C-alpha cells in the first residue's frame, strides 16, 4: 500500500512537471506558436464581449461586470454577458488556445496577443452612429486590430508577425444593435429611408472591415448570421397586449440582413484570392431551441433566467438599471436557453459553438471553423 502511494506521488509529481514545462514552453517560445497554432481574433458585440466594456466610460446597462453574470464557470463577473463562457471561449478551447482576453484588459502582455484577442464590445454596431460614445464600434475595433498587428510585427519580427495574421481565424458577430438602436431611441430613420437601404449600410460597413482585415493579411473568417432576436424574451414583451409575440418590425430587418450577409460573403469569396469563410446559421440554431427547448436539454426556451417582468424580459439582471432595483434569478440556470433578456446561457453557447466548430454544411458553410483552423 505504501509503495503504491509512493508510486502515485512520483507519477503526479512527474506529470505536473511535464504540464508546467509545456505551459512555460508555450508562453516563452513564440516560434512554436507561429508554427503550430492559428490565433483567434474576435470582433463584435455583447454576444462576444469578453469584458472590454469594463474599461470604457459607459452606462451600467452596457456592462456585465456584476453578479450574477459569470456565476457558473468563473464564479465572478468578467464582463461577459452570460452566466459563464461565451461562444469564442469554447471555440478557443476546441482550437487548443488559451482563453482569449479582452483587448482593453490591463493585464494583457505582448506575449498574449499571438494567440489572439477580443475587440468585441457590448452594444457595438457596424454603424458609427449606433449607441455613439457608449461602445467600441466596429470601425474602432478595426483600428485596435491594426495596433495589435503592428505590435505583432515588432515583437515577433516582420515574417513571423505576418504569419500569425495570415494563419489566424477572424470571428464576427455584428449588426443586431444597429437594428435595435432606432427602436430604442424612437428614431424616424425607417420613415425617411427604406429598410433595405439601411441594411445595405450595415452589411456594407461589415464587409468593408472584412476587406481591411484581408488587406492586412487575414484570410480565414468566421461569421454568425443574425439570430432570432425578434423573439428573444425582451422582444416578446414589447407589445404588452400580446405577450409572447415576436417583435415583427425587426423580423424583416433580420431576414434582409441574413440574405445580404450571405450574398456579400459569396461575392467576397469570388473577389478576394484565398478568402475562406465559415457562416453559421445562428438564426435557425436559436429558433429551434426557442420553439422546442426540451429537444436540446432545456426546460425554458423563451423565459430568461435573470430579469424581471413577464418572461423576465426586462433588462434588470444584476441591477443593470440601478443598484437598488430588484431582479429575479432562476434556481437552475442549465434549464434555460436565455440567461437574461437577450443573451444566452453558457450551456446554450456551448451547443452553438459546437455547431460552428464542427457542424455539417447545412448549419455552417462552406467550411466549419475546425476546417479553417486546420488550413495553413
Swiss-Prot record:
Catalytic residues (UniProt): 46, 340, 343
Subcellular location field: Secreted
Phenotype reported upon loss of the gene: In glip2, enhanced auxin responses, and higher susceptibility to E.carotovora.
Keyword annotations: Auxin signaling pathway, Glycoprotein, Hydrolase, Lipid degradation, Lipid metabolism, Plant defense, Secreted, Signal
Pfam family for this entry, one: Lipase_GDSL
E.C. code: 3.1.1.-
UniProt induction comment: In roots, by salicylic acid (SA), jasmonic acid (JA), and ethylene (ET) treatments.
UniProt superkingdom: Eukaryota
Top-tier EC class: hydrolase
Reported tissue expression: Expressed seedlings, roots and stems.
GO molecular function: lipase activity
Coarse class of the protein's main subcellular location: secreted
Gene Ontology CC annotation, any one: extracellular region
Glycosylation sites: 36, 186, 205, 362
InterPro entries attached to this UniProt entry: GDSL, GLIP1-5/GLL25, Lipase_GDSL_AS, SGNH_hydro_sf, SGNH_plant_lipase-like
A GO biological process held by the record: lipid metabolic process
Signal peptide feature range: 1-25
Job description of the protein: Involved in the resistance to the necrotropic bacteria Erwinia carotovora, probably via negative regulation of auxin signaling. Possesses lipase and antimicrobial activities, inhibiting germination of fungal spores (e.g. Alternaria brassicicola).
Family that this chain belongs to: Belongs to the 'GDSL' lipolytic enzyme family.
Official protein name in the record: GDSL esterase/lipase 2
Phylogenetic classification of the source organism: Eukaryota, Viridiplantae, Streptophyta, Embryophyta, Tracheophyta
